[in-house]
Amino acid sequence: VGMLFQHGALYSAFTVLENIAFPLRELKALPEDLVRDAVMVKLQMVGLDPAHAHKMPADLSGGMVKRVALARALIMDPPLLLLDEPTAGLDPDRSDAFCDLLRSLHRELGLTVVMVTHDLDTIYEISTRVAVVADRHVIVNAPPREVIGFDHPFVRNFFLGGRGLRAMELLRLHPADV
C-alpha cells in the first residue's frame, strides 16, 4: 500500500532522493545504485525532472512536494494507493495537472486509488465511485451521478449547495439529470 499524506510528510532533513528512497532503503534488499535508479524512474513518472533529486523539501513548491510524496508512495510499486486530500493547497491549474497525473497513473499502472477529499472538482474529475461518510457511517457508495441524487441532508448540502452546484455546472451536470 502506498500513502500520500495531505501535506506530503517529507522528511525535512532529507533530500528529495533520500525521501523517495527511504522505504527501499529500510528493506536493505537492493544495492544503492538500483535504489537511485528506481528513485529517478519514479521522479520522472510523477512529472519531475531528475535534477530535483538533490533539492531539500524546503526548496520545493507545494505542488512539487505533493509529487515527491507521490513518488515515495509509488516507490514500492503498490497495487493500492491511499490519498489524503491530494489537491489541498494547490492552485487550480496545479490541481488539474495533479488530477491528470493521478488518472494517468491509475490507467497505466492499474492502481486502485482510495482518496479522501472535500474538493468537489476533484471528486467529479477523477472519481468513479464515491463513498460519503456522515453521522460516522458510510451512507452511500456509488458513482458520482448516483450520489448526487441520494436523499440525505448531508449529501444535499455538500453536493447540491452553492459550491456543489457551481462544480456541477462546470461539468455540465444538472440536478435534474441525476
What residues fall within each predicted segment?
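Conserved ABC ATPase signature
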Residues: M56-L60, M64
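Conserved catalytic motifs of ABC-family nucleotide-binding domains
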Residues: D77
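Helical segment within the ABC ATPase nucleotide-binding domain
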Residues: D96-E108
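Catalytic Walker B motif of ABC-type/P-loop ATPase nucleotide-binding domains
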Residues: L81-D84
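A short, surface-exposed alpha-helical micro-motif characterized by mixed small hydrophobic
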Residues: I123-E125
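Conserved ABC ATPase "signature" region
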Residues: D33-A51
